[in-house]
């Protein structure tokens, strides 16, 4: 079976690249699939993730990321040029290698992938959720225009998604967000590493993990920790992630919690940091899935999380293996953290249950679901 994955880039540490690289490496190690990978960003630059040498790859060097810093009028012009080049190179490549299955991450190639007559089954796997995908928000434009452009984008997207052989979403919650589609299924992200150790949940330490961006809501977490700090000044919070952390360090100082809160860069031994912690906090405004939540829970660390769209409600069973609170409610987040701080027995019980509950996200189980999907697609090819 010949499978092509459209990855985009592996230049920066992020959830989607981590998940895709782990998935591709698993298939390379455990199957006899012939695997290909399409990249688009900055040929020649080092990757953040290692890829099994069995995987063949090509980098079209389109560099869509260059558009991020351009003004809108230039961005539109150069996007059209880059997209035209991308479509031609993508089409030529698929027509040359003739894969059995092409897996898109529902990025720029979704606009033309269904029109390529290479004979492959087309699968889309989205690493966002509908509520935050293809939103158009420009502060200098009227709200009605932003809504109009977003509506056009979604209409165009749905036309392409309906044509896919399968559309894979990450959560049951997001599954319900796509009522127009009859080709959708749920396959969650997997935990690629399941540790053989557990946290004691006895250290006076909470942890949060994610990029230093608006999405991850660390500004909300710091405000919540100010409330926690007033009751429990002996507890500390450590945040780990990539990106610019200076504004969060400034906010910590403004809130008076900088002595007990540290914003760290991303680390390679994050599981060791989980083990040293007793509470995991997810303060995201939205997620595609929230894999860090499951990873922390696999080490026996109970979580307090916003019930943001989408993922946490699929992972946490409130009051059983973690705590879910109203999305964006800073006081509720602080109360959930304080509840675990003040009840060590409850905290440890939730941690024990957390380890058990996330076993359903083990890599073997999730990749078996992908294998079944690929086999189903090939069976359909045989019958067609």
What feature does the model see in each segment?
Residues 3, 101-103, 116-136, 147:
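Active-site proximal beta-strand in glycosyltransferases
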Residues 6-13, 26, 30-77, 177, ...:
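N-terminal strand-loop element at the rim of the active site
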Residues 14-22, 204, 208-227, 246, ...:
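A conserved mid-protein helix/loop that constitutes part of the nucleotide-sugar donor-binding site
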Residues 37-45, 209, 236-248:
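Glycosyltransferase donor-sugar binding loop
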Residues 266, 285:
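Aromatic "clamp/platform" in nucleotide-sugar-dependent glycosyltransferases that forms part
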Residues 302-306:
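Short hydrophobic beta-strand element within catalytic cores of glycosyltransferases
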Residues 317-319, 323-330, 338-344, 359:
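Conserved acidic donor-binding segment of nucleotide-sugar-dependent glycosyltransferases
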């Amino acid at each position: 079976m010949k499978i092509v994955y459209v990855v985009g880039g592996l230049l920066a540490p992020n959830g989607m690249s981590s998940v895709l690289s782990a998935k591709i490496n698993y298939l390379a190690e455990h199957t006899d699939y012939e695997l290909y990978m399409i990249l688009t960003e900055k040929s020649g630059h080092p990757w953040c993730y290692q890829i099994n040498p069995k995987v063949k790859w090509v980098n079209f060097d389109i560099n869509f990321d260059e558009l991020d810093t351009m003004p809108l009028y230039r961005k539109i012009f150069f996007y059209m040029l880059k997209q035209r080049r991308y479509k031609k190179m993508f089409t030529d490549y698929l027509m040359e290698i003739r894969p059995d299955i092409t897996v898109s991450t529902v990025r720029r190639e979704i606009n033309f992938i269904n029109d390529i007559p290479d004979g492959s089954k087309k699968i889309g796997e989205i690493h966002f959720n509908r509520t935050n995908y293809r939103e158009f928000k420009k502060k200098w434009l009227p709200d009605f225009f932003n809504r109009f452009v977003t509506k056009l984008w979604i209409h165009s997207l749905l036309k392409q998604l309906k044509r896919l052989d399968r559309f894979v979403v990450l959560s049951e919650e997001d599954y319900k967000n796509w009522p127009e589609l009859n080709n959708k299924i749920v396959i969650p992200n997997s935990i690629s590493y399941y540790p053989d150790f557990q946290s004691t949940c006895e250290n006076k330490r909470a942890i949060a993990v994610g990029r230093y961006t608006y999405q991850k809501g660390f500004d909300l977490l710091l405000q919540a920790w100010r409330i926690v700090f007033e009751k429990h000044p002996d507890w500390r919070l450590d945040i780990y992630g990539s990106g610019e952390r200076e504004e969060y360090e400034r906010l910590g100082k403004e809130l008076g919690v900088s002595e007990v809160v540290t914003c760290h860069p991303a680390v390679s031994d994050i599981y060791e940091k989980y083990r040293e912690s007793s509470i995991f906090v997810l303060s995201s405004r939205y997620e595609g899935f929230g894999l860090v939540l499951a990873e922390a829970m696999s080490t026996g660390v109970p979580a307090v999380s916003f019930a943001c769209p989408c993922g946490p409600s699929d992972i946490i069973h409130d009051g059983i293996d973690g705590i879910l609170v109203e999305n964006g409610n800073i006081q509720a987040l602080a109360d959930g953290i304080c509840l675990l701080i003040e009840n060590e027995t409850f905290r440890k019980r939730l941690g024990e249950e957390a380890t058990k509950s996330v076993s359903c996200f083990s890599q073997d189980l999730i990749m078996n679901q992908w294998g079944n999907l690929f086999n189903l697609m090939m069976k359909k090819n045989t019958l067609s």
